[in-house]
């Protein structure tokens, strides 16, 4: 750990000189990039400097104890050493946390895709419950939500819904929601009172910039058609809905939420870029995830991550074994405690890797 900290400190000093160089400032794009890199290192370097200063103070005090000093002063020095040693432990933990690699996507906006799984109409209603849960959670953070694509059922459920969440740090907290969500409850249509199990799949994708993923326009097929509502009835007299197919990967994205064909195409392209980026990232990180079987999981769409049990009023996250008996408020967006638990477990796993 110390070797890495020394490397970061040296790099920070080099960058301090570079960003003060007038010739480097002439290239604004490069200068801003270096300034960001410098700023990202500042906290860890400041903490490391304090860590070294505290260690030095301990050594200085120990040297003082070797001298012939009065008992009262000796007691004070020994008390100082105790406090400083406690501070060293605190700083070591802080440094370990700061050394945990940050996900470069953490500050980005996200696309959330919810699809009804096994369970027919009941699964579609559960998908609608999850959509409401995430929009309510977004409201608690003052994040904005915006529908991209909606396939609604006649009874108010969703076969599929894709929506965007805009806000600082949205991906850092919502990324843990990818996977299969399972619900156990008695459907309104069930006369015998038998509990049914249904599922919905959630995919959370970071919004990507053009520089993150390149798409060859020749690899795309764009189809336009008239937007439809419940039961397929036409709700628009123009071909405003857009379907984009990425031929090499077979990915298909549709968007009909906007009245303008151009806006629907822009939204669909954003979703397509995020899906392609997610596909590439999943392939890249597959070997890492295999080497270190994380409790929090890999974000695999097929991984059953959580159960919502209505009769018992509980929600259980199977990745960390956490059960909360507050299902009603949880589905109203009160999911912070669960997400904090997932973050804590992931951070502790990463800290083990550093140690």
Swiss-Prot record:
Pfam families the UniProt entry points to = PCRF, RF-1
Q: Please report the PTM annotation for this entry.
A: Methylated by PrmC. Methylation increases the termination efficiency of RF1.
Q: Which PROSITE patterns match?
A: RF_PROK_I
Q: Supply the InterPro entries for this chain.
A: PCRF, Pep_chain_release_fac_I, Pep_chain_release_fac_I_sf, Prokaryotic/Mito_RF, RF-1
GO molecular function terms noted in the UniProt entry: translation release factor activity, codon specific
Key words of the record: Cytoplasm, Methylation, Protein biosynthesis
Q: Where in the cell is it found?
A: Cytoplasm
Please indicate if the UniProt record lists Cell membrane as a keyword. Answer: no
Q: Name one GO cellular component term.
A: cytoplasm
Q: Which residues carry this modification: N5-methylglutamine?
A: 233
Source superkingdom: Bacteria
Task: Tell me which HAMAP family the record gives.
Answer: Rel_fac_1 (MF_00093)
Similarity comment:
Belongs to the prokaryotic/mitochondrial release factor family.
Q: What does this protein do?
A: Peptide chain release factor 1 directs the termination of translation in response to the peptide chain termination codons UAG and UAA.
Q: What is this protein called?
A: Peptide chain release factor 1
Q: Which organism is it from?
A: Clostridium tetani (strain Massachusetts / E88)
Q: What's the encoding gene here?
A: prfA
